Each structure stands twice: as structure tokens, then as C-alpha cells.
Amino acid sequence: MAETDPKTMQDITLVVETLLQQMQDKFQIMSDQIIGRIDDMSSRIDDLEKNIADLMTQAGVEELDPENKIPTAQKS
């Protein structure tokens, strides 16, 4: 097997390091975007839950106990 020139090894190392850094940067950007979208979705879900609770209150519907699914007025 032929020996690899030290200059060639440095070039290969540099290319691999650059490629790995680019991949890491892209994954970080994607991760940040995903986390941002999850945060947005969480805020929207919170708003939706609040709006549903407000609509239920306006309609005179009692909120259900989340553990037993029994209207809170019937709980003893």
C-alpha cells in the first residue's frame, strides 16, 4: 500500500472537519427551528384550551374533572 503524502492527509483532514462542521451547523439550525415550532404549537394549544374553556363558560357547560371525567358539580 502506498504511503499517503502528509500534505494530502492534511487536506483530507481539513475537508472532513469542514464537512462535519457544516453538518453540525445545519443540524443546529434544524433543531432550533423544530424547538421554535414546538413552542409556537404549545402557545397555540394553550390559547385553544383557553378559548374552549371560555366558550364552555359562555354556554353554561361545566368543566369536567380531568381525572374522573365527572362534572365538578357532581363530585362529592
Curated annotation (Swiss-Prot):
GO CC annotation: axon cytoplasm; nucleus
Cell compartment(s), UniProt: Nucleus
Gene Ontology molecular-function annotations: identical protein binding; transcription corepressor activity
Chief localization: nucleus
N-terminal signal peptide: none
InterPro entries assigned to the protein according to its UniProt record, in alphabetical order: HS1-bd
Keywords assigned by UniProt, alphabetized: Nucleus
GO biological process: axonal transport of mitochondrion; endodermal cell differentiation; muscle contraction
Stored Gene3D superfamilies: 1.20.5.430
Role according to the record: Negative regulator of the heat shock response. Negatively affects HSF1 DNA-binding activity. May have a role in the suppression of the activation of the stress response during the aging process.
Similarity comment text for this entry: Belongs to the HSBP1 family.
Quaternary state and interactors: Homohexamer. Associates with heptad repeats of HSF1 trimers and probably also HSF1 monomers, and with HSP70. Association with HSF1 trimers and HSP70 coincides with attenuation of heat shock response and the conversion of HSF1 trimer to monomer.
Protein name from the UniProt record: Heat shock factor-binding protein 1
Lineage: Eukaryota, Metazoa, Chordata, Craniata, Vertebrata
Gene that specifies this protein: Hsbp1
